[in-house]
């Protein structure tokens, strides 16, 4: 497969690796971007965290509520300047009202919904014409909780990052604290038991290759490989699992201990950042 300049540029944007390294990675993986990223990580050229929060557009994420239902939705613009414009802000509010009042759960449902004798898609096109930038509704998610549970939310930078938490018991301030923590620490999983098996396998393979390379370079015995890999994997899990992270308001206490002390637990959480799935 021919490796193009655009493919190299995209890989460099996501990894910050050098041009030659990106070209070699793409050649080794036959142009597969995700496999090329893993290849660079195995070689120790790039870390996983470097691509996590890159944004491809601007906009805002909002959360609206109706009793036991919450709806997250993301509206994109091309620049931050337009996202702060009153026309964009009003459109954001209108879409939230339409979603909430009609319990709409997909982008298609919203775009085809008739609002004041026009569809929401028509409204987006109107705002695109007024603002001079393409305005798009990217995604929607409905979250339903039980009666005894509670929602907690936190918005960073007005909605560039928005977090929704479902907590077991009715503790509003605790739910908000956990949502703020998630916005800041960006955990990938709720706890070690919830870690995706494919993710775990991929990370372990990468750590094995990195560690083996390091041991060979340092002329150390390979029989210690498995122990080092497991220790590094355990450290990674502590960093990416919500329950194991140091609590944002007290770094001497883990999140799971904070929750246990307050007799509650996190049922689920959703952290959205602009233009990232």
Swiss-Prot record:
Molecular function via GO: translation elongation factor activity
The keyword Cytoplasm appears for this protein: yes
CDD domains: UBA_EF-Ts
Region (Involved in Mg(2+) ion dislocation from EF-Tu): 79-82
Keyword annotations from UniProtKB, A to Z: Cytoplasm, Elongation factor, Protein biosynthesis
Major subcellular site: cytoplasm
Top-level division of the source organism's lineage: Bacteria
Free-text function comment from the UniProt entry: Associates with the EF-Tu.GDP complex and induces the exchange of GDP to GTP. It remains bound to the aminoacyl-tRNA.EF-Tu.GTP complex up to the GTP hydrolysis stage on the ribosome.
Protein name from the UniProt record: Elongation factor Ts
Organism: Phytoplasma australiense
Gene this protein is translated from: tsf
């Amino acid at each position: 497969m021919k490796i193009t300049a655009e493919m190299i540029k995209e890989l460099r944007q996501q990894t910050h690796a050098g041009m030659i390294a990106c070209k070699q990675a793409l050649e080794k993986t036959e142009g597969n971007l995700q496999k090329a990223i893993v290849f660079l990580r195995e070689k120790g050229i790039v870390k996983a965290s470097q691509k996590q929060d890159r944004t491809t557009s601007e906009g805002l994420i909002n959360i609206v509520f109706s009793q036991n239902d919450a709806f997250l939705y993301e509206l994109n613009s091309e620049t931050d300047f337009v996202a702060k414009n009153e026309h964009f802000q009003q459109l954001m509010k209108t879409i939230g009202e339409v979603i909430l009042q009609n319990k709409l759960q997909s982008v298609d449902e919203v775009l085809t919904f008739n609002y004041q004798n026009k569809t929401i898609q028509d409204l987006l096109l109107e705002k695109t014409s007024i603002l001079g930038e393409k305005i798009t509704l990217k995604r929607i998610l409905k979250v339903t909780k039980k009666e005894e549970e509670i929602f907690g939310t936190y918005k960073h930078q007005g909605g560039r990052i928005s977090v929704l938490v479902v907590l077991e018991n009715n503790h509003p301030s605790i739910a908000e604290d956990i949502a703020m923590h998630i916005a800041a620490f960006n955990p990938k999983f709720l706890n070690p038991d919830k870690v995706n098996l494919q993710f775990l396998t991929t990370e372990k393979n990468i750590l094995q290759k990195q560690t083996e390379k390091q041991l060979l370079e340092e002329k150390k015995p390979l029989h210690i490989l498995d122990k080092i890999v497991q220790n590094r994997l355990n450290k990674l899990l502590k960093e990416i699992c919500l329950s194991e992270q140091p609590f944002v308001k007290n770094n001497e206490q883990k999140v799971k201990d904070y929750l246990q002390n307050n007799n509650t637990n996190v049922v689920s959480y959703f952290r959205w950042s602009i233009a990232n799935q």
